[in-house]
Each structure stands twice: as structure tokens, then as C-alpha cells.
């Protein structure tokens, strides 16, 4: 995500354990009946949206995650902003659980996998070894992002600007034109709703059935409100759905019912 847009981000809530109360508040809501096996159809392709923010395409055994932002903590530390230096290990552990759950043939990391070009060089040996383990026995594709337009040798996997597979195109930054079948990241969508007298914000998928913008997967990645014009402009109006993440379920909420910041 660009530096300017990052400034508009709220700080990540990050802890999925906080979502249990959110789920309780949404129980029985007319907006959604939360599902663990939440399906989102994009250009006629049935995808499984995981409550962690990943997408699985069963027909292709393909797992997609966006905006890992590995080594964001160490990047901030270098500028004097001290954060616990465990974001890379936390993000990789969450990804390992996903891979164990879905056993994908191909993993696609949808850009901004590293917070900056120096990220791969700041990784601990243990974290680098974990990436090697995760890549074992499957294809792995790093999509170029604005934070990581190229990656050094030795990180494993393949590197590309986009991936076209069947009716779907995977890229980091959403195209400004209406693009059927596009799956992108970059914007870190987050939805905000009012429930029982308080506002609740959660990461979300944003989709109108033609295109899908994925939430950021990284432990320290923030979120941009789905009512922000950068997201609304992609869909032409508020005629899309925010699929809000909870600890174990996803809740579909009409974007028009979401709150602005």
C-alpha cells in the first residue's frame, strides 16, 4: 500500500481473540448469518473465504493471501518506533495453520509480502527457514507489490507481476478500470458498523461478485475503511458487500450499511 494511503489506515486490531464479542453482537443480525465456510463468487468462480483473511480456490487447490508485510516491526524499529519484533513469526505461524488446513497445490502471496526491500535481509534465520518449510511440496508465487517490487534470490518460490488463471487475474494493486475476475490486495479493506450502541471495526473482503479486494493478512497491517473513496471508486458506488472477519466466521454486510470513520 502507498505511503499516503497508509496514513489513512487505522492501527491494526490484529488479535482475532477480540472477535468473539463481535460475533456475539452480530448473532441474529438481519445483515448476515455468519458462516465459517463462507463462499464468495467472483466472475462465476466459487471461492472459500477464510476467517483469517485468506481465500482458497478448491478447483485449483490455490491459496491466496495478501499484504503479509513481513518485517514491518523491524522497519519501524529502524525509524525509532519500537514494536514487539514478532510480527513475521506470528504471520508465518498463521499461514502455516492455513496451509495445514487446506493443503494447497499453489500459494499466491498477493504483493507487499515484505514491508520494504530490506525485509528479506532483516529476517531471522528461523523465519527464513519457516518460509522454506511452508514452500516444501507445493508451488509458491510471490506477486510484486509497491513495497516489494522485486525480491532477492534465495527467498524461494517464483516471482511475477500478475497471475492469470481461468477467468481470474491476481495482482497486487486493483486496476482503476472495472476489471471482471480481478483479485487484488493493497488497500487493506476494513468495515465499521454500529452494534448495540458502539462502533465495531474489522478487516473484511470487499466484493461485488465481479472483483474482490482482499484484507491484509499481516499481523501489523492496518485497515482502510470501505467507505473511503479509494475503495468505493473501484466499485463505482456502495453496491458491494463487506465480508467482515470474526474469529471463526465471516459476516456479510452491505457496504451502504457500513459507517464512515
Model segments located where?
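Extended recognition/assembly regions associated with phosphoester-bond processing machinery
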Residues: 2-4, 9-11, 15, 20-261
Amino acid at each position: 500500500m502507498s505511503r499516503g494511503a497508509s496514513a489513512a489506515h487505522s492501527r491494526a486490531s490484529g488479535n482475532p481473540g477480540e472477535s468473539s464479542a463481535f460475533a456475539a453482537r452480530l448473532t441474529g443480525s438481519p445483515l448476515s448469518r455468519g458462516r465459517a465456510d463462507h463462499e464468495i463468487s467472483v466472475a462465476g468462480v466459487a471461492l472459500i473465504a477464510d476467517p483469517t483473511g485468506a481465500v482458497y480456490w478448491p478447483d485449483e487447490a490455490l491459496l491466496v493471501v495478501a499484504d503479509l508485510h513481513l518485517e514491518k516491526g523491524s522497519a519501524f524499529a529502524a525509524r525509532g518506533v519500537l514494536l514487539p519484533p514478532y510480527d513475521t513469526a506470528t504471520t508465518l505461524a498463521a499461514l502455516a495453520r492455513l496451509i495445514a488446513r487446506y493443503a494447497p497445490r499453489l500459494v499466491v502471496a498477493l504483493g507487499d509480502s515484505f514491508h520494504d526491500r530490506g525485509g528479506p535481509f532483516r529476517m531471522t534465520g528461523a523465519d527464513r527457514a519457516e518460509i522454506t518449510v511452508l514452500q516444501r511440496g507445493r508451488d509458491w508465487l510471490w506477486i510484486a507489490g509497491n513495497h516489494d517490487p522485486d525480491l532477492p534470490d534465495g527467498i524461494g518460490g517464483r516471482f511475477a507481476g500478475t497471475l492469470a488463471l481461468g477467468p481470474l487475474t491476481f495482482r497486487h494493486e486493483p486496476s482503476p478500470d472495472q476489471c471482471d475476475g480481478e483479485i487484488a490486495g493493497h488497500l487493506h479493506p476494513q468495515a465499521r458498523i454500529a452494534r448495540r450502541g458502539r462502533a465495531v471495526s474489522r478487516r473484511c473482503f470487499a466484493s461485488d461478485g465481479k472483483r474482490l479486494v482482499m484484507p491484509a493478512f499481516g499481523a501489523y497491517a492496518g485497515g482502510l475503511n470501505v467507505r473511503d473513496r479509494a475503495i468505493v471508486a473501484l466499485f463505482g458506488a456502495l453496491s458491494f458487500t463487506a465480508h467482515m472477519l470474526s474469529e471463526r466466521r465471516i459476516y456479510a454486510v452491505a457496504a451502504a450499511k457500513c459507517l464512515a470513520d
